[in-house]
């Protein structure tokens, strides 16, 4: 396509897509350099915060009443890896087809929102108009690697973060395949449970009682029965009360380990009953479930003698943002969308985002990516976003963010 005719904001977006912030070796220095250059060009005050170990780019537009609670626009700059062979184009070339679909890793998750937030900040600064509250932007690393990251999870516990004095955070949502837009007000808690069973050994030709595998199987079966219940309530819900994935607890057996290997080969001793067997589960729990009670449930499942469990991922707290008339941020957000004839659907995010760290501090957070009429392709091959949808997203944010920042 002839790039001369391209909208300048689309060009900036495509430049940002080309920066290799994909794991496992994200180039954060290049993304930081890009953001800093843009901040300078747009006259947005900025700083690069490095205390958590990787650079976080912060931008700030001071309000008329800087003591009021502020608004934070948070976005992560890292992206998940892309399997080149499964893509029809180079996932880091930001290739655009004739209809304006831009293909690239991060087009939906979430380099689009990074650049839309940046453009909103530029327009506010350029307008010369002072807003009531202070507006902060944070561009963080390591969202995609969860617990081991040096991004938001660590940043929220710093003095720097506390000083931002945040009243509301906007962060990523998901694309919507329909004409509606989705807003997320909570997430499911990711719990990864590792269960170990120990039991009696013996020769494979005998009826040995109380073996590790037997005990583990009993527990696995109980947990898979629970999985089936949840699956059915989701399936049932699609016809009855509109239950979505974010409303139920999902549970998958993702690790299974037993058997006595012969030396260090791939062969096993088929005639030896192993004394130990292990299983791992990926469990995602909606914020409507009491986590203490669910922990008791896991203890009950693993109560049999010889069984024990530990967490590979565990969060004890999973706050959600209340969407009622007491939440003035939500009323303001809704009102802005209504004025633009935008139909909002509210949901629990089926996976995890940085919003959970914010909500667990008691700060409300909305997950919202202004992408509609687009298939959900985050983390998928051939992830794309149409340039018109991207540009409309900037206008949508312009219809929402200044109102939030000007809120009484
Ligand atoms: Zn994301
Ligand atoms: Zn992601």
From Swiss-Prot:
InterPro entries: Aminoacylase-1_M20A, ArgE/DapE_CS, Bact_exopeptidase_dim_dom, N-acyl_aa_amidohydrolase, Peptidase_M20, Peptidase_M20_dimer
Active site: 78, 143 (proton acceptor)
Keyword Ribonucleoprotein: no
Name of the molecule in the record: Aminoacylase-1
Pfam families with a match to the protein in the record: M20_dimer, Peptidase_M20
Gene: acy1
Primary enzyme class: hydrolase
Protein's GO biological process: amino acid metabolic process
Matches recorded under Gene3D superfamilies: 1.10.150.900, 3.30.70.360, Zn peptidases
């Amino acid at each position: 396509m002839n790039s001369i005719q391209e909208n300048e904001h689309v060009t900036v977006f495509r430049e940002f897509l080309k920066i290799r912030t994909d794991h496992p070796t994200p180039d954060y220095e290049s993304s930081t350099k890009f953001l800093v250059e843009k901040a300078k060009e747009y006259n947005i005050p900025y700083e690069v915060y490095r205390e958590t170990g990787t650079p976080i780019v912060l931008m700030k537009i001071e309000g008329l009443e800087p003591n009021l609670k502020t608004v934070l626009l948070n976005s992560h700059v890292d992206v998940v890896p892309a399997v080149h062979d499964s893509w029809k184009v180079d996932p880091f070339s930001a290739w655009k087809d004739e209809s304006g679909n831009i293909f690239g890793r991060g087009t939906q998750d979430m380099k689009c929102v990074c650049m839309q937030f940046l453009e909103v900040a530029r327009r506010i600064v350029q307008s010369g108009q002072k807003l009531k509250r202070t507006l902060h932007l944070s561009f963080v690393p390591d969202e995609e690697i969860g617990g081991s990251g040096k991004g938001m999870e660590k940043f929220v516990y710093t003095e720097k973060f506390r000083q931002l004095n945040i009243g509301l955070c906007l962060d990523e949502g998901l694309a919507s395949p329909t004409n509606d837009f989705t807003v997320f007000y909570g997430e499911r808690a990711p719990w990864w449970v590792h269960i170990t069973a120990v039991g009696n050994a013996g020769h494979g030709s005998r009826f040995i009682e109380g073996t590790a595998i037997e005990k583990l199987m009993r527990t696995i079966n109980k947990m898979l029965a629970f999985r089936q219940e949840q699956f059915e309530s989701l399936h049932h819900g699609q016809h009855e009360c509109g239950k979505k994935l974010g409303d139920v607890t999902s549970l998958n057996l993702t690790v299974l380990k037993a058997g006595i290997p012969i030396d260090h080969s791939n062969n096993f001793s088929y005639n030896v009953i192993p004394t130990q067997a292990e299983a791992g589960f990926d469990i995602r729990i909606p914020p409507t479930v009491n986590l203490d009670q669910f922990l008791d449930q896991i203890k009950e499942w693993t109560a049999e003698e010889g069984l024990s469990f530990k967490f590979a991922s565990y969060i004890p707290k999973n706050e959600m943002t209340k969407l009622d008339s007491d939440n003035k941020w939500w009323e303001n957000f809704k009102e802005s969308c209504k004025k633009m004839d935008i139909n909002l659907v509210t949901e629990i995010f089926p996976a995890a985002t940085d919003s959970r760290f914010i909500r667990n501090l008691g700060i409300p957070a909305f997950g919202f990516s202004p992408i509609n009429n687009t298939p959900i392709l985050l983390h998928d091959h051939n992830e794309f976003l149409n340039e018109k949808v991207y540009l409309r997203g900037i206008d949508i944010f312009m219809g929402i963010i200044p109102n939030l920042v000007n809120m009484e």
